[in-house]
Amino acid sequence: MDEQKHHEELIKGISEQMKSVLGKSEQAIYIYLDDNHKVCNKKFADLLGYKSPKEWADADAPLSDVVEEDQQSVINAYTNASEKMVASDIEVRVKNVETDKIVKTRMIIAPVGHAGHVFTVHFFSKI
């Protein structure tokens, strides 16, 4: 199995594993393996103005929804989670692609293991 297919299977597997969390949480959530392999719940897609979770997952630039000044903080938190296994809690401003409105959020990012790989899970709450 090539890497692309393997990563597709991994994201499908963790989506199933986390299905109840994604569906029942009051928070906007996304799970990230890499730029091409990610999944979110409907609340996250709605927060950013996407028509569906699939539309967000198909977007190529994962940081394009984050205000430029906050992007480095998100990158640092991701690095801590994916490489050091350290969770972070940071303030992040995101942009709704439909309205261009800036939304202030608190993001909790934590590492999660699945099938021998480290994913990052991002929980967002408006502030």
What do these predicted regions represent?
Residues 1-16, 125-127:
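PAS-associated C-terminal cap
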Residues 27, 90-91, 108:
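Short loop/turn microsegments at loop-to-beta-strand junctions
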Residues 33, 40-42:
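PAS-family and closely related small sensory beta-sandwich domains used
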Residues 38, 45-64, 71-72:
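PAS and related sensory helical modules
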Residues 69-93:
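Terminal output helix/cap of sensory domains in signal transduction proteins
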